Amino acid sequence: MNITWIIAILILMLFAHIVDDYYLQGWLASAKQKKWWEKNAPDKLYKFDYIMALFCHALSWSTMIFLPILVYSLINNVSLNLFYLAIPINLIIHAIVDDLKANKFKINLIVDQSIHFIQIIITWVIFLFIYCN
């Protein structure tokens, strides 16, 4: 794999992060907050619905950041084993981090985004290690 592909994949992963975390979240940005449910649907039936919103956003984000690697893998007919691990691991981390920011108020936006960037870099480095050896 040449350096152009390597850098392009990282840039596309970062771009996918920006698109998904800022432009595609829409209603989920509100729905992943407990306080939104308490205000708009105070019935006990909806008490934990914010968890599903966190899950949906984290799944979308995890899939989006992996799309450049997925496309590369399909074009070059290489194993998708990383896909089966990266999506659930990134999903869990992303959901926990967003919950810490949106509901627990333990971290701010800078820490939230820094952790997401680290997730992307680690996923990219693992991709390089697997596919460039």
Predicted regions and their residues:
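Alpha-helical transmembrane segments
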Residues: N2-F15
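Core segments of transmembrane alpha-helices
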Residues: M52-V71, I115-T123
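Interfacial loop-to-transmembrane junctions
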Residues: I96-I118
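Juxtamembrane boundary at the C-terminal end of a transmembrane helix
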Residues: W124-N133
